[in-house]
Amino acid sequence: KGRGVLCIYCLIGKSESALNKVLQLLEEYGALEYTIVVAATAAMPPGQQYLAPYSACSIGEHFMNKGGHVLVGFDDFTRHAWIYRELSLLLERSPGREAYPGDIFYLHSQMIERAAYLLEEQSGGSMTFLPIVETLQGDVTGYIPTNLISMTDGQVYLSTALFSEGFKPAIDLGLSISRIGSKVQWPAIKELSGMLRLEYLQYRELEKLARVKSAGGEEIEKRLRKGRIVTELIKQDKNRPVPLEEQVVLFYFFRQGKLDPLSLEEAKKFKATLAERVLKEKPDLLKAIREKKTLTPEIKEELDRLIQIASDKGWLQEKGGA
């Protein structure tokens, strides 16, 4: 929102109620102003469902060729593959693995290749794809998921188990991969979160061991406590993404070790009230981070002053803050 990006949401083979839920959500947050919805529900003919993503691509290309920036979300490619399999079997084409036709990989790879970033002399527009695929009982080695993984610049894997534990968004950091990663991150985020993924994965392994082995030393307890705080910091409430500049401030406090003495409840409270407190004490800091996108000496100095203010005003006290 407010970034000059046109969004296209393409729904394939899902129910009318699922479509209405998405439309209601987009309308509630004012996203319909910059979003085009291309929908072919399960009640529509198979041919229409098959053509829906191609229609979304063509609409996106129209705006890309005019110099615009487009994000296309496909919900989802699993159902599109099912529809193509159904049509192919009706046409008596030879079935292959899992009864899919032999050109199922070509079908999706050809579509993915339409995403591009054009040169300035060719309008300078861009189109980014965000395809969604369902997994069967969390198996990412299925035919369609592995096909898509081989085509894209990475994947975000959402785990049912993590969702049940209350970790939302339920992103499995072990199975989620980015092939471009830090190249597209803000330098500030890259500097502060470089080791965060490894630290979190080590915490998850340590937590599993701690469940089996009750005895643990002081160092183990310290690492577990720090891991729980990391887990709390990377959680987000539903439909409430945390702006990157707020993440920079939050992880700066964490990297300076200022959150280590906090209990889990106090860490939650600190995270929930941080943005409001920063705007009150340092109204220009978030704007400066958003514009510079890097931890300049001036921004670090302001962040250090903010830490001092936090200490003086009791934000970091374990039993209640200002």
Identify what each model region corresponds to.
Residues H62, R79, L89-A322:
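Conserved catalytic/coupling modules of large nucleotide/cofactor-utilizing molecular machines
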Residues L11-S15, A40-M44, D76-T78, T135, ...:
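Short, ordered loop/turn segments at secondary-structure junctions
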